[in-house]
Amino acid sequence: MTTSTASADKALNQAQRPVVQALMAALPKGTVILGGAVTERSAGIWRSDQIQAQVLVRPKTTEEVSCALRICHEHHQSVVPHGGLTGLVEGALTQPLDIVLSTERLNVIEEISASERTMVVQAGVMLQSVQEAAASEGLMFPLDLGSRGSCTLGGNLSTNAGGNRVIRYGMARDMVLGLEAVMADGTVISSMNRMIKNNAGYDLKHWFLGTEGTLGIITRAVLRCREEVTTAPTALVAINSFDALVAFLKQLDRGLAGNLSAFEVMWQNFYQLVTQPPAPNQRPLQDDAAYYVLVEAMGAAQEQLEAILEQALEAELIVDAVVSQSSQQTDQLWGLRDDVAQTFQFSPVFLFDVSLRLSEMARYVDAVNAGLAARFDAPKNFVLGHVGDGNLHFAIAVGGDSRAQREGVEAAVYEPLKAIQGSVSAEHGVGLEKKPYLHFVRDEAEIQLMRTIKAAMDPRGILNPGKIF
Protein backbone atom coordinates (compact mmCIF):
# COMPACT_ATOMS: atom_id res chain seq x y z
CA MET A 1 0.00 0.00 0.00
CA THR A 2 1.46 3.40 -0.98
CA THR A 3 1.69 6.36 1.41
CA SER A 4 -1.15 8.17 -0.37
CA THR A 5 -3.30 5.02 -0.34
CA ALA A 6 -2.58 4.47 3.33
CA SER A 7 -3.59 8.05 4.08
CA ALA A 8 -6.83 7.63 2.13
CA ASP A 9 -7.47 4.34 3.93
CA LYS A 10 -7.23 6.10 7.28
CA ALA A 11 -9.93 8.54 6.15
CA LEU A 12 -12.33 5.70 5.29
CA ASN A 13 -15.42 5.18 7.35
CA GLN A 14 -14.84 2.27 9.70
CA ALA A 15 -17.79 0.37 8.22
CA GLN A 16 -16.17 0.36 4.76
CA ARG A 17 -12.75 -0.94 5.76
CA PRO A 18 -13.55 -4.67 5.47
CA VAL A 19 -15.07 -4.41 1.99
CA VAL A 20 -12.30 -2.12 0.73
CA GLN A 21 -9.61 -4.43 2.08
CA ALA A 22 -11.33 -7.40 0.41
CA LEU A 23 -11.55 -5.54 -2.91
CA MET A 24 -7.90 -4.48 -2.81
CA ALA A 25 -6.81 -8.02 -1.99
CA ALA A 26 -8.85 -9.60 -4.79
CA LEU A 27 -8.39 -7.12 -7.64
CA PRO A 28 -5.25 -6.07 -9.54
CA LYS A 29 -3.21 -3.15 -8.25
CA GLY A 30 -4.64 0.20 -9.34
CA THR A 31 -8.17 -1.11 -9.72
CA VAL A 32 -9.37 0.37 -6.42
CA ILE A 33 -8.73 4.06 -5.75
CA LEU A 34 -9.54 5.95 -2.58
CA GLY A 35 -10.01 9.36 -1.01
CA GLY A 36 -9.11 12.53 -2.88
CA ALA A 37 -8.44 10.67 -6.11
CA VAL A 38 -12.18 9.89 -6.05
CA THR A 39 -13.73 12.94 -4.43
CA GLU A 40 -11.94 15.35 -6.78
CA ARG A 41 -13.87 13.84 -9.68
CA SER A 42 -16.90 15.70 -10.98
CA ALA A 43 -20.31 14.24 -10.19
CA GLY A 44 -21.32 14.87 -13.82
CA ILE A 45 -20.31 16.96 -16.82
CA TRP A 46 -23.35 19.20 -16.32
CA ARG A 47 -22.74 19.59 -12.58
CA SER A 48 -20.44 21.76 -10.45
CA ASP A 49 -20.17 19.39 -7.46
CA GLN A 50 -17.91 16.39 -6.87
CA ILE A 51 -18.45 12.70 -6.18
CA GLN A 52 -19.36 12.08 -2.54
CA ALA A 53 -18.24 8.45 -2.49
CA GLN A 54 -14.75 7.78 -1.12
CA VAL A 55 -14.04 4.56 -3.03
CA LEU A 56 -13.98 3.87 -6.77
CA VAL A 57 -13.37 0.55 -8.54
CA ARG A 58 -12.12 0.52 -12.16
CA PRO A 59 -12.31 -3.05 -13.50
CA LYS A 60 -10.81 -3.93 -16.88
CA THR A 61 -12.70 -7.18 -17.46
CA THR A 62 -16.09 -8.72 -16.86
CA GLU A 63 -14.41 -11.11 -14.43
CA GLU A 64 -13.16 -8.18 -12.37
CA VAL A 65 -16.64 -6.62 -12.36
CA SER A 66 -18.01 -9.95 -11.17
CA CYS A 67 -15.40 -10.22 -8.43
CA ALA A 68 -16.07 -6.68 -7.22
CA LEU A 69 -19.84 -7.14 -7.11
CA ARG A 70 -19.58 -10.51 -5.38
CA ILE A 71 -17.50 -8.92 -2.62
CA CYS A 72 -19.83 -5.92 -2.34
CA HIS A 73 -22.84 -8.25 -2.19
CA GLU A 74 -21.24 -10.28 0.60
CA HIS A 75 -20.62 -7.07 2.58
CA HIS A 76 -24.04 -5.51 1.82
CA GLN A 77 -22.13 -2.65 0.17
CA SER A 78 -24.00 -0.23 -2.12
CA VAL A 79 -22.55 0.24 -5.62
CA VAL A 80 -23.25 3.10 -8.05
CA PRO A 81 -22.20 2.46 -11.69
CA HIS A 82 -20.51 5.30 -13.58
CA GLY A 83 -20.02 5.70 -17.32
CA GLY A 84 -19.51 9.06 -19.04
CA LEU A 85 -21.56 10.96 -16.43
CA THR A 86 -23.55 12.81 -19.09
CA GLY A 87 -26.92 11.98 -17.54
CA LEU A 88 -29.39 14.68 -16.56
CA VAL A 89 -31.59 13.00 -13.93
CA GLU A 90 -29.17 12.37 -11.03
CA GLY A 91 -28.98 8.71 -11.96
CA ALA A 92 -25.30 8.41 -10.97
CA LEU A 93 -25.20 10.54 -7.82
CA THR A 94 -23.45 8.96 -4.86
CA GLN A 95 -23.59 9.07 -1.08
CA PRO A 96 -20.44 9.07 1.12
CA LEU A 97 -20.73 5.35 1.94
CA ASP A 98 -21.33 4.20 -1.65
CA ILE A 99 -18.69 2.58 -3.83
CA VAL A 100 -18.47 3.74 -7.44
CA LEU A 101 -17.93 1.12 -10.14
CA SER A 102 -16.61 2.93 -13.20
CA THR A 103 -16.57 1.33 -16.65
CA GLU A 104 -13.81 3.69 -17.85
CA ARG A 105 -11.32 0.83 -18.40
CA LEU A 106 -13.84 -1.45 -20.13
CA ASN A 107 -13.01 0.46 -23.29
CA VAL A 108 -12.28 -2.09 -26.02
CA ILE A 109 -14.07 -2.58 -29.33
CA GLU A 110 -13.58 -6.34 -29.52
CA GLU A 111 -14.91 -7.22 -32.95
CA ILE A 112 -16.53 -5.76 -36.06
CA SER A 113 -18.18 -7.97 -38.67
CA ALA A 114 -18.94 -6.09 -41.87
CA SER A 115 -20.70 -9.10 -43.41
CA GLU A 116 -22.96 -9.67 -40.39
CA ARG A 117 -23.21 -5.94 -39.64
CA THR A 118 -22.44 -6.43 -35.95
CA MET A 119 -19.99 -5.06 -33.40
CA VAL A 120 -18.94 -6.44 -30.02
CA VAL A 121 -18.18 -3.51 -27.73
CA GLN A 122 -17.32 -3.08 -24.06
CA ALA A 123 -19.45 -0.79 -21.92
CA GLY A 124 -16.89 1.98 -21.39
CA VAL A 125 -16.37 2.79 -25.08
CA MET A 126 -17.54 6.27 -26.04
CA LEU A 127 -20.44 6.46 -28.47
CA GLN A 128 -18.42 8.52 -30.95
CA SER A 129 -15.72 5.83 -30.99
CA VAL A 130 -18.39 3.22 -31.78
CA GLN A 131 -19.69 5.37 -34.64
CA GLU A 132 -16.20 5.92 -36.06
CA ALA A 133 -15.25 2.25 -35.80
CA ALA A 134 -18.42 1.26 -37.63
CA ALA A 135 -17.73 3.81 -40.37
CA SER A 136 -14.20 2.44 -40.84
CA GLU A 137 -15.79 -0.86 -41.95
CA GLY A 138 -18.44 0.69 -44.19
CA LEU A 139 -21.12 0.43 -41.51
CA MET A 140 -23.20 2.84 -39.46
CA PHE A 141 -24.25 2.62 -35.83
CA PRO A 142 -27.42 4.74 -35.88
CA LEU A 143 -27.55 5.92 -32.26
CA ASP A 144 -26.55 9.58 -32.14
CA LEU A 145 -26.65 12.13 -29.31
CA GLY A 146 -25.24 15.59 -28.77
CA SER A 147 -22.99 14.14 -26.04
CA ARG A 148 -21.54 11.51 -28.42
CA GLY A 149 -17.96 12.51 -27.55
CA SER A 150 -18.45 11.97 -23.80
CA CYS A 151 -21.21 9.42 -23.22
CA THR A 152 -20.39 5.72 -23.04
CA LEU A 153 -22.17 2.79 -24.59
CA GLY A 154 -22.99 1.24 -21.22
CA GLY A 155 -24.71 4.42 -20.11
CA ASN A 156 -26.55 4.67 -23.43
CA LEU A 157 -27.89 1.15 -23.02
CA SER A 158 -28.67 1.32 -19.31
CA THR A 159 -30.81 4.41 -19.94
CA ASN A 160 -32.17 3.19 -23.31
CA ALA A 161 -30.97 6.40 -24.94
CA GLY A 162 -32.92 7.94 -27.79
CA GLY A 163 -31.31 10.80 -29.65
CA ASN A 164 -31.64 12.31 -33.08
CA ARG A 165 -32.64 9.35 -35.27
CA VAL A 166 -35.30 7.52 -33.27
CA ILE A 167 -37.88 8.39 -35.92
CA ARG A 168 -36.14 5.95 -38.28
CA TYR A 169 -33.98 3.57 -36.25
CA GLY A 170 -35.68 3.40 -32.85
CA MET A 171 -34.23 3.66 -29.35
CA ALA A 172 -30.94 2.17 -28.12
CA ARG A 173 -32.60 -1.15 -27.23
CA ASP A 174 -33.55 -1.57 -30.90
CA MET A 175 -29.84 -1.59 -31.85
CA VAL A 176 -28.78 -4.33 -29.43
CA LEU A 177 -28.76 -8.02 -30.37
CA GLY A 178 -27.22 -9.31 -27.17
CA LEU A 179 -25.36 -8.21 -24.09
CA GLU A 180 -23.40 -9.31 -21.08
CA ALA A 181 -24.21 -8.01 -17.61
CA VAL A 182 -23.18 -8.77 -14.06
CA MET A 183 -25.85 -9.15 -11.41
CA ALA A 184 -25.63 -7.88 -7.85
CA ASP A 185 -24.18 -11.12 -6.46
CA GLY A 186 -21.51 -11.31 -9.17
CA THR A 187 -23.36 -13.74 -11.45
CA VAL A 188 -22.43 -13.10 -15.08
CA ILE A 189 -25.32 -13.20 -17.55
CA SER A 190 -23.64 -13.65 -20.93
CA SER A 191 -26.54 -13.31 -23.33
CA MET A 192 -24.31 -12.35 -26.27
CA ASN A 193 -26.81 -13.27 -28.97
CA ARG A 194 -25.78 -12.36 -32.53
CA MET A 195 -29.00 -13.23 -34.34
CA ILE A 196 -31.80 -10.85 -35.28
CA LYS A 197 -34.29 -13.67 -34.74
CA ASN A 198 -34.02 -15.66 -31.51
CA ASN A 199 -37.24 -16.56 -29.71
CA ALA A 200 -35.69 -19.28 -27.53
CA GLY A 201 -37.02 -18.30 -24.13
CA TYR A 202 -36.93 -14.92 -22.42
CA ASP A 203 -34.91 -12.17 -24.11
CA LEU A 204 -32.84 -11.42 -21.01
CA LYS A 205 -31.13 -8.32 -22.37
CA HIS A 206 -34.26 -6.28 -21.68
CA TRP A 207 -33.78 -6.73 -17.91
CA PHE A 208 -30.71 -4.51 -18.23
CA LEU A 209 -31.67 -2.09 -21.03
CA GLY A 210 -33.25 1.06 -19.63
CA THR A 211 -33.07 -0.08 -15.99
CA GLU A 212 -30.36 2.43 -15.02
CA GLY A 213 -27.95 -0.04 -13.45
CA THR A 214 -30.45 -1.11 -10.79
CA LEU A 215 -30.70 -4.77 -11.89
CA GLY A 216 -27.17 -5.38 -13.14
CA ILE A 217 -24.15 -3.69 -14.67
CA ILE A 218 -23.72 -4.01 -18.44
CA THR A 219 -20.16 -4.97 -19.43
CA ARG A 220 -20.36 -5.88 -23.14
CA ALA A 221 -22.87 -5.76 -25.98
CA VAL A 222 -23.46 -7.08 -29.47
CA LEU A 223 -24.63 -4.12 -31.53
CA ARG A 224 -26.69 -4.21 -34.69
CA CYS A 225 -25.23 -1.90 -37.32
CA ARG A 226 -26.54 -0.82 -40.70
CA GLU A 227 -24.88 -0.31 -44.04
CA GLU A 228 -23.16 3.05 -44.24
CA VAL A 229 -25.38 5.68 -45.82
CA THR A 230 -23.67 7.64 -48.58
CA THR A 231 -26.28 10.39 -48.88
CA ALA A 232 -27.99 12.34 -46.13
CA PRO A 233 -29.47 15.54 -47.55
CA THR A 234 -30.18 18.01 -44.78
CA ALA A 235 -32.27 21.16 -44.65
CA LEU A 236 -33.39 23.80 -42.19
CA VAL A 237 -37.00 24.87 -42.67
CA ALA A 238 -39.00 27.77 -41.22
CA ILE A 239 -42.69 27.19 -40.40
CA ASN A 240 -45.30 29.53 -38.93
CA SER A 241 -47.89 27.20 -37.38
CA PHE A 242 -47.88 23.88 -35.59
CA ASP A 243 -50.65 22.54 -37.82
CA ALA A 244 -48.46 23.28 -40.83
CA LEU A 245 -45.54 21.57 -39.07
CA VAL A 246 -47.57 18.38 -38.59
CA ALA A 247 -48.72 18.46 -42.22
CA PHE A 248 -45.12 18.97 -43.37
CA LEU A 249 -43.98 15.96 -41.31
CA LYS A 250 -46.63 13.82 -42.99
CA GLN A 251 -45.57 15.09 -46.41
CA LEU A 252 -41.93 14.23 -45.70
CA ASP A 253 -42.82 10.77 -44.43
CA ARG A 254 -44.81 10.03 -47.56
CA GLY A 255 -42.44 11.65 -50.03
CA LEU A 256 -39.22 10.19 -48.65
CA ALA A 257 -40.60 6.64 -48.52
CA GLY A 258 -39.00 5.69 -45.22
CA ASN A 259 -35.79 7.71 -45.57
CA LEU A 260 -36.69 10.45 -43.07
CA SER A 261 -34.04 10.07 -40.36
CA ALA A 262 -34.42 13.29 -38.35
CA PHE A 263 -37.16 15.83 -37.74
CA GLU A 264 -35.75 18.14 -35.08
CA VAL A 265 -37.77 21.20 -34.11
CA MET A 266 -36.57 24.41 -32.48
CA TRP A 267 -39.13 26.86 -31.17
CA GLN A 268 -38.48 30.48 -32.15
CA ASN A 269 -36.89 31.58 -28.88
CA PHE A 270 -34.35 28.74 -28.93
CA TYR A 271 -33.45 29.45 -32.56
CA GLN A 272 -32.99 33.13 -31.74
CA LEU A 273 -30.82 32.25 -28.75
CA VAL A 274 -28.41 30.06 -30.74
CA THR A 275 -28.13 32.45 -33.72
CA GLN A 276 -27.54 35.73 -31.88
CA PRO A 277 -24.47 36.90 -29.90
CA PRO A 278 -22.87 35.63 -27.74
CA ALA A 279 -23.61 32.38 -29.62
CA PRO A 280 -20.96 31.84 -32.33
CA ASN A 281 -23.36 30.30 -34.87
CA GLN A 282 -24.33 31.83 -38.19
CA ARG A 283 -28.02 32.50 -38.85
CA PRO A 284 -29.04 30.54 -41.97
CA LEU A 285 -32.67 31.81 -41.97
CA GLN A 286 -34.41 34.90 -40.62
CA ASP A 287 -35.56 34.46 -37.04
CA ASP A 288 -39.18 35.63 -37.28
CA ALA A 289 -40.86 32.24 -37.84
CA ALA A 290 -42.57 30.30 -35.07
CA TYR A 291 -40.70 27.01 -35.63
CA TYR A 292 -37.46 25.85 -37.26
CA VAL A 293 -37.19 22.24 -38.39
CA LEU A 294 -33.94 20.41 -39.08
CA VAL A 295 -34.70 17.69 -41.62
CA GLU A 296 -32.36 14.82 -42.49
CA ALA A 297 -33.10 12.13 -45.07
CA MET A 298 -30.50 9.36 -44.92
CA GLY A 299 -30.35 7.42 -48.17
CA ALA A 300 -32.43 9.88 -50.19
CA ALA A 301 -31.23 11.98 -53.10
CA GLN A 302 -30.86 15.70 -52.51
CA GLU A 303 -33.11 16.38 -55.49
CA GLN A 304 -35.82 14.30 -53.81
CA LEU A 305 -35.73 16.44 -50.67
CA GLU A 306 -35.58 19.67 -52.67
CA ALA A 307 -38.67 18.65 -54.66
CA ILE A 308 -40.61 18.03 -51.44
CA LEU A 309 -39.55 21.42 -50.09
CA GLU A 310 -40.72 23.12 -53.28
CA GLN A 311 -44.11 21.42 -52.95
CA ALA A 312 -44.33 22.49 -49.32
CA LEU A 313 -43.55 26.09 -50.25
CA GLU A 314 -46.23 26.06 -52.94
CA ALA A 315 -48.73 24.61 -50.44
CA GLU A 316 -47.70 27.31 -47.93
CA LEU A 317 -46.77 24.71 -45.32
CA ILE A 318 -43.33 26.26 -44.96
CA VAL A 319 -42.19 29.86 -45.36
CA ASP A 320 -38.47 29.42 -46.06
CA ALA A 321 -35.80 26.74 -46.30
CA VAL A 322 -32.09 26.28 -46.79
CA VAL A 323 -30.59 23.01 -48.06
CA SER A 324 -27.06 22.09 -47.05
CA GLN A 325 -24.59 22.03 -49.92
CA SER A 326 -21.63 20.51 -48.07
CA SER A 327 -20.70 18.46 -45.02
CA GLN A 328 -19.48 21.67 -43.39
CA GLN A 329 -22.88 23.30 -43.84
CA THR A 330 -24.58 20.17 -42.50
CA ASP A 331 -22.41 20.32 -39.38
CA GLN A 332 -23.32 24.00 -38.96
CA LEU A 333 -27.04 23.25 -39.16
CA TRP A 334 -26.75 20.43 -36.63
CA GLY A 335 -24.63 22.73 -34.49
CA LEU A 336 -27.66 24.97 -33.98
CA ARG A 337 -29.77 22.11 -32.71
CA ASP A 338 -27.01 20.77 -30.46
CA ASP A 339 -26.07 24.12 -28.88
CA VAL A 340 -28.24 23.67 -25.79
CA ALA A 341 -25.35 25.04 -23.72
CA GLN A 342 -26.39 28.56 -24.81
CA THR A 343 -29.28 28.31 -22.37
CA PHE A 344 -26.80 28.14 -19.49
CA GLN A 345 -26.17 31.89 -19.77
CA PHE A 346 -29.46 32.15 -17.85
CA SER A 347 -28.32 29.70 -15.15
CA PRO A 348 -29.63 28.17 -13.05
CA VAL A 349 -31.56 26.27 -15.71
CA PHE A 350 -33.98 23.39 -15.18
CA LEU A 351 -33.85 20.79 -17.97
CA PHE A 352 -36.79 18.55 -18.89
CA ASP A 353 -37.30 15.58 -21.20
CA VAL A 354 -40.93 14.65 -21.82
CA SER A 355 -42.90 12.70 -24.40
CA LEU A 356 -46.48 13.00 -25.56
CA ARG A 357 -48.75 12.58 -28.55
CA LEU A 358 -48.10 14.92 -31.43
CA SER A 359 -51.75 16.01 -31.42
CA GLU A 360 -51.33 17.37 -27.86
CA MET A 361 -47.97 19.06 -28.30
CA ALA A 362 -48.84 22.66 -29.19
CA ARG A 363 -51.51 22.93 -26.49
CA TYR A 364 -49.19 21.35 -23.96
CA VAL A 365 -46.38 23.85 -24.59
CA ASP A 366 -48.90 26.68 -24.23
CA ALA A 367 -50.10 25.15 -20.94
CA VAL A 368 -46.53 24.90 -19.61
CA ASN A 369 -45.80 28.51 -20.52
CA ALA A 370 -49.05 29.65 -18.91
CA GLY A 371 -48.21 27.69 -15.76
CA LEU A 372 -44.76 29.27 -15.59
CA ALA A 373 -46.15 32.77 -16.14
CA ALA A 374 -48.68 32.25 -13.35
CA ARG A 375 -45.96 31.23 -10.89
CA PHE A 376 -42.95 33.39 -11.80
CA ASP A 377 -42.00 36.84 -13.05
CA ALA A 378 -40.49 36.79 -16.56
CA PRO A 379 -39.72 33.05 -16.83
CA LYS A 380 -37.76 31.80 -19.84
CA ASN A 381 -38.65 28.49 -21.49
CA PHE A 382 -36.48 27.45 -24.42
CA VAL A 383 -38.20 24.62 -26.29
CA LEU A 384 -36.77 22.12 -28.75
CA GLY A 385 -37.06 18.44 -29.39
CA HIS A 386 -37.30 15.29 -31.44
CA VAL A 387 -40.84 16.16 -32.46
CA GLY A 388 -40.95 13.41 -35.08
CA ASP A 389 -41.00 10.85 -32.26
CA GLY A 390 -43.03 12.90 -29.75
CA ASN A 391 -40.15 14.04 -27.52
CA LEU A 392 -39.76 17.60 -26.20
CA HIS A 393 -36.96 19.20 -24.21
CA PHE A 394 -37.39 22.32 -22.08
CA ALA A 395 -34.63 24.54 -20.66
CA ILE A 396 -36.37 26.74 -18.10
CA ALA A 397 -34.92 29.66 -16.13
CA VAL A 398 -36.88 31.49 -13.42
CA GLY A 399 -34.09 33.45 -11.73
CA GLY A 400 -33.13 30.90 -9.08
CA ASP A 401 -33.09 27.26 -8.08
CA SER A 402 -34.53 27.17 -4.58
CA ARG A 403 -36.60 24.18 -3.61
CA ALA A 404 -39.79 26.24 -3.96
CA GLN A 405 -38.75 27.42 -7.42
CA ARG A 406 -37.89 23.88 -8.53
CA GLU A 407 -41.21 22.55 -7.27
CA GLY A 408 -43.05 25.36 -9.03
CA VAL A 409 -41.31 24.69 -12.33
CA GLU A 410 -41.89 20.93 -12.04
CA ALA A 411 -45.57 21.51 -11.32
CA ALA A 412 -45.87 23.73 -14.40
CA VAL A 413 -44.27 21.03 -16.57
CA TYR A 414 -45.63 17.80 -15.11
CA GLU A 415 -49.20 18.59 -14.05
CA PRO A 416 -50.50 19.30 -17.58
CA LEU A 417 -48.43 16.35 -18.83
CA LYS A 418 -50.16 14.00 -16.40
CA ALA A 419 -53.55 15.23 -17.62
CA ILE A 420 -52.76 14.12 -21.19
CA GLN A 421 -51.04 10.86 -20.18
CA GLY A 422 -47.58 11.86 -21.35
CA SER A 423 -44.29 10.63 -19.89
CA VAL A 424 -41.99 12.51 -17.51
CA SER A 425 -39.02 10.77 -19.13
CA ALA A 426 -38.77 10.23 -22.86
CA GLU A 427 -35.11 9.21 -23.07
CA HIS A 428 -33.09 10.43 -20.06
CA GLY A 429 -34.30 7.92 -17.47
CA VAL A 430 -35.73 8.52 -14.00
CA GLY A 431 -32.78 8.58 -11.59
CA LEU A 432 -33.45 10.57 -8.44
CA GLU A 433 -34.76 13.70 -10.13
CA LYS A 434 -37.92 12.21 -11.63
CA LYS A 435 -38.54 9.61 -8.97
CA PRO A 436 -41.27 11.70 -7.24
CA TYR A 437 -43.19 11.83 -10.53
CA LEU A 438 -42.97 8.20 -11.60
CA HIS A 439 -46.55 7.66 -10.41
CA PHE A 440 -47.69 10.25 -12.98
CA VAL A 441 -46.73 7.72 -15.67
CA ARG A 442 -46.91 4.27 -14.05
CA ASP A 443 -49.76 2.96 -11.91
CA GLU A 444 -49.25 1.27 -8.54
CA ALA A 445 -49.43 -2.24 -10.02
CA GLU A 446 -46.63 -1.41 -12.47
CA ILE A 447 -44.44 0.15 -9.78
CA GLN A 448 -45.01 -2.79 -7.46
CA LEU A 449 -43.97 -5.18 -10.23
CA MET A 450 -40.78 -3.15 -10.68
CA ARG A 451 -40.09 -3.51 -6.95
CA THR A 452 -40.72 -7.26 -7.16
CA ILE A 453 -38.26 -7.63 -10.04
CA LYS A 454 -35.68 -5.53 -8.19
CA ALA A 455 -36.05 -7.65 -5.04
CA ALA A 456 -35.63 -10.87 -7.02
CA MET A 457 -32.53 -9.75 -8.94
CA ASP A 458 -30.90 -7.63 -6.23
CA PRO A 459 -32.29 -8.90 -2.91
CA ARG A 460 -29.87 -6.84 -0.82
CA GLY A 461 -30.60 -3.67 -2.79
CA ILE A 462 -26.96 -2.78 -3.43
CA LEU A 463 -27.16 -1.69 -7.09
CA ASN A 464 -27.70 2.05 -7.63
CA PRO A 465 -29.91 2.23 -4.53
CA GLY A 466 -32.76 4.71 -4.34
CA LYS A 467 -32.93 5.35 -8.07
CA ILE A 468 -36.17 5.11 -10.14
CA PHE A 469 -38.66 4.17 -7.38
Regions found by a protein language model. Give the residues of each.
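N-terminal flexible segment immediately upstream of the FAD-binding catalytic core
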Residues: M1-R70, G87-R117, G146, F270-Q282, ...
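Alpha-helix capping/hinge segments and adjacent helical runs
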Residues: K29, A419-V430, P459-L463
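Activity-critical C-terminal alpha-helical subdomain
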Residues: T187, K435-F469
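FAD-binding subdomain of flavoenzyme oxidoreductases
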Residues: V108-E264, L463
